Design a protein with these regions (language model features):
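Conserved beta-strand/loop block within the catalytic cores
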Residues: 1-2
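Active-site/substrate-binding loop(s) of hydrolase catalytic cores
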Residues: 6-18, 22-155
Length: 156
């Protein structure tokens, strides 16, 4: 769809596989799409909502699979490499956009203009108390405007 065709819709962007050793989001996203479209008539079950999904953001790292990558992680036996083929950690490239992967993602982001971006990092097999965890930036390090926004949406 063209961007103008999406005006008036709630737009969600799902990004998986930013670190190839944390690839569960790719599998979960593909399963989600399967379940959302595997209904009678294959109709999208959420009218007024558009979804863009990047299943493997770090393709170089995903394809560089080895049992010697991330040896301190609790499984799986083989996993991809954390960085790109140029050894960039894409998680640290959002501002500078040095990598072609990040420039492509930011192009999609700017064109799609999502209301919500879900970056599906995963743990290394640790057993956490909660099914879903999230992280907010350290309050005292934020710009005053961001502090106000964070307090309004997440803390009040």
């Amino acid at each position: 769809a063209e961007p103008e065709d999406l005006s008036g819709t709630l737009r969600l962007l799902l990004v998986a596989g930013i670190h190839a050793g944390e690839i569960e989001g790719k599998d979960a996203g593909i399963m989600l799409l399967r379940d959302l479209t595997n209904n009678e008539g294959h109709r999208w079950p959420f009218p007024g909502t558009s979804l863009a999904f990047v299943p493997i953001f770090n393709l170089d790292g995903h394809e560089r699979s080895s049992r010697f990558n991330r040896i301190n992680q609790n499984g799986p036996d083989n996993m991809g490499w954390r960085g790109t083929s140029q050894r960039y950690n894409l998680n640290r490239d959002f501002l500078k956009a040095d990598t072609p992967e990040m420039r492509a993602l930011l192009g999609l982001w700017n064109q799609f203009d999502p209301h919500l971006v879900y970056d599906s990092h995963t743990t290394d097999g640790a057993d956490y108390q909660y099914d879903l965890t999230w992280h907010l930036e350290q309050f005292d390090l934020l710009d005053a405007g961001l502090r106000k926004w964070q307090r309004r949406f997440f803390e009040d």
